[in-house]
Amino acid sequence: MSFRTLELFAGIAGISHGLRGISTPVAFVEINEDAQKFLKTKFSDASVFNDVTKFTKSDFPEDIDMITAGFPCTGFSIAGSRTGFEHKESGLFADVVRITEEYKPKIVFLENSHMLSHTYNLDVVVKKMDEIGYFCKWVTCRASIIGAHHQRHRWFCLAIRKDYEPEEIIVSVNATKFDWENNEPPCQVDNKSYENSTLVRLAGYSVVPDQIRYAFTGLFTGDFESSWKTTLTPGTIIGTEHKKMKGTYDKVINGYYENDVYYSFSRKEVHRAPLNISVKPRDIPEKHNGKTLVDREMIKKYWCTPCASYGTATAGCNVLTDRQSHALPTQVRFSYRGVCGRHLSGIWCAWLMGYDQEYLGYLVQYD
């Protein structure tokens, strides 16, 4: 079987790509015009809508098995404001709930910042999904556990409608793991262009497809080594009752919620070997706006995760500061591979996230 899927906040359909053979996308909701163009080209049989706040079932009155939503994380992520659900964009979770209540799909799959594992955020998301009839289980993990060269740290939640008995999934396509060990493109390009900046932004907004598959299949089967199996058998996860900590740092990193109680479970993680990237300061220009300049070599275990905002600053900072050493364009510029005056490559950013050029099509066809 394959789930007929509505993907909200779709971007370049990274969740659908990660769940290829498990999910069949029939409709997308995405506000970014560049992403809309890609979706209409890549998924010509699917419908594309542009505003999640106005979208209703009357716009697409067909049966849906699954809704997926990587709703904006600006209010939660370390790179964002960390204002939680008070942030306008992160508050769009209310539209996820509204649309879920309209369609009543068998499954809802959510993706967001690892900050969602804090119980004050779980109290909003998980308890609301429970209230509307969904049993939630979730996992928090970094992209380096599936081989990526960065550590995108995300929270994934599988919400199953309480009256639905999950069925065995026979994966309908031969999906294979992304190869981060070969065919790495150059990390910089000579010139700044609209096409390159667009791909940097789209990669930064996107998910890591293999990380999506790892989380979904692990939560569905109870086996976190099942990502590339051709048959996925529903399974259970057994945890222990979570003992709440005092203060705001209480977390349930991997867990589920049942009968008004949080449970946590453990799982084995093996991360890829560190890259140990050397980042060194260079000659300091007379004019710069940098504060807290770095005056020594820094060793970064992994590359920083691509971020959408880098699309407007692909050259990076002209001096190395402690803060800018955590921004990918500057990190690349001052690494052993970087050249001052060149620009962060969108094709390389997409490679870091785990998208092959065949999938991206025209998005990578620029100089």
Curated annotation (Swiss-Prot):
UniProt xrefs under Gene3D superfamilies: Vaccinia Virus protein VP39
Q: Which residues form the active site?
A: 73
Q: Which Pfam families has this protein been placed in?
A: DNA_methylase (PF00145)
One Gene Ontology biological process: methylation
Could you tell me what reaction this enzyme catalyses?
A: a 2'-deoxycytidine in DNA + S-adenosyl-L-methionine = a 5-methyl-2'-deoxycytidine in DNA + S-adenosyl-L-homocysteine + H(+)
| SUPFAM superfamilies, per the entry | S-adenosyl-L-methionine-dependent methyltransferases
Q: Which domain of life is it from?
A: Viruses
Q: What class of enzyme is it?
A: transferase
This enzyme's EC code(s): 2.1.1.37
In this protein, which residues make up the domain named SAM-dependent MTase C5-type? 3-367
Sorted alphabetically, which keywords does the UniProt record give? DNA-binding, Methyltransferase, Restriction system, S-adenosyl-L-methionine, Transferase
- GO terms for MF: DNA (cytosine-5-)-methyltransferase activity; DNA binding
Q: Which InterPro entries match?
A: C5-MTase, C5_DNA_meth_AS, C5_MeTfrase, SAM-dependent_MTases_sf
Q: Which NCBIfam families match?
A: dcm
Q: Which family does the similarity line name? A: Belongs to the class I-like SAM-binding methyltransferase superfamily. C5-methyltransferase family.
Q: What is this protein called?
A: Type II methyltransferase M.CviJI
Organism of derivation: Paramecium bursaria Chlorella virus IL3A (PBCV-IL3A)
Gene name linked to the record: CVIJIM
